[in-house]
UniProtKB/Swiss-Prot annotation:
Compartments reported by the entry: Cytoplasm
Protein's name according to its UniProt entry: SsrA-binding protein
Protein family membership: Belongs to the SmpB family.
GO terms for biological process, alphabetical: trans-translation
Record-level GO cellular component terms: cytosol
Coarse class of the protein's main subcellular location: cytoplasm
GO MF: RNA binding
Stored Pfam families: SmpB (PF01668)
Top-level taxon of the source organism: Bacteria
């Protein structure tokens, strides 16, 4: 009998874009694949990716990830030129792509990268259809978050 693969310790999350949830209302989320080169996969396994300043552009019926940085490893092959900030093609189904194109063309909407993670040894990117927040919306979110923490603190001390 074959042995089952043991799950690797640690989180499946590679990178998060926390700023996206602070600056945008995320209305719809999509899971996409990434078209990567070999050295990029190695740097993802080492956790050397940054998607905090990244965004998605739709061109010629395809989606591309711009602004992300994959730091090349020092042990990477010398005959391959590593470009850490190159644009990467996103792998979406035609129906999902049509939905994104239709909704992103409305005023005030954009597509942002939310998180990057491993799913069955495949690198996946979660993207979101987003609408920008105003300053008062951001303040309301901070107020709600602080009240939630205070409420939990009060309940904890009340139960003693």
């Amino acid at each position: 009998m074959t042995k089952k693969k043991s799950h690797k310790p640690g989180s499946a999350t590679i990178a998060m874009n926390k700023r996206a949830r602070h600056e945008y209302f995320i209305e719809e989320e999509f899971e996409t694949g990434l078209s990567l080169q070999g050295w990029e996969v190695k740097s993802l396994r080492a956790g050397k990716a940054n998607i905090s300043d990244s965004y998605i552009l739709l061109r010629d019926g395809e989606a591309f990830l711009f602004g992300s940085t994959f730091q090349p490893l020092s042990v990477a092959s010398s005959h391959i030129v590593c470009d850490p900030t190159r644009s990467r093609k996103l792998l979406l189904k035609k129906r999902e792509l049509d939905t994104l194109i239709g909704k992103a063309n409305r005023d005030g909407y954009t597509i942002v990268a939310l998180s990057m993670y491993w799913k069955n040894a495949w690198a996946k990117l979660k993207i979101g259809l987003a609408k920008g927040k105003k300053e008062h919306d951001k303040r309301d979110d901070i107020k709600d978050r602080e009240w939630k923490l205070d409420k939990a603190r009060i309940m904890k001390h009340a139960n003693r």
